[in-house]
């Protein structure tokens, strides 16, 4: 995840008729991002729009493959978390909701 942070990059990989719901507490925000938020007085929305907040890559995986994918990533030494879900939600089409 690069420029555009989580909010602007995730919609690029999902169809327009779907939305993404991210659980902000599903991973630990690295200390550098806590520092940036505090020292820069940056609100959460702007943090997620500007930075990856410690999420370097996102894999969109079918529910049936989540456990297998997490096991594989852990086995090869990667930190991995389920951070959200893709939803068929007309109210939030093509958007990312982080809460």
Give the label of every model feature segment:
Residues 1-99:
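Glycine-/charge-enriched secondary-structure boundary and capping motifs
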């Amino acid at each position: 995840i690069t420029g555009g942070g989580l909010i602007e990059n995730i919609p690029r990989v999902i169809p327009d008729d779907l939305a993404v719901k991210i659980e902000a507490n599903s991973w630990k925000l690295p200390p550098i991002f806590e520092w940036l938020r505090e020292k820069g007085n940056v609100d959460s929305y702007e943090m997620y729009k500007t930075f990856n907040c410690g999420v370097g890559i996102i894999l969109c995986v079918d529910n049936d493959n989540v456990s297998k994918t997490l096991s594989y990533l852990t086995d090869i030494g990667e930190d991995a978390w389920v951070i959200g879900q893709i939803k068929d939600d007309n109210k939030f089409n093509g958007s990312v909701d982080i809460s």
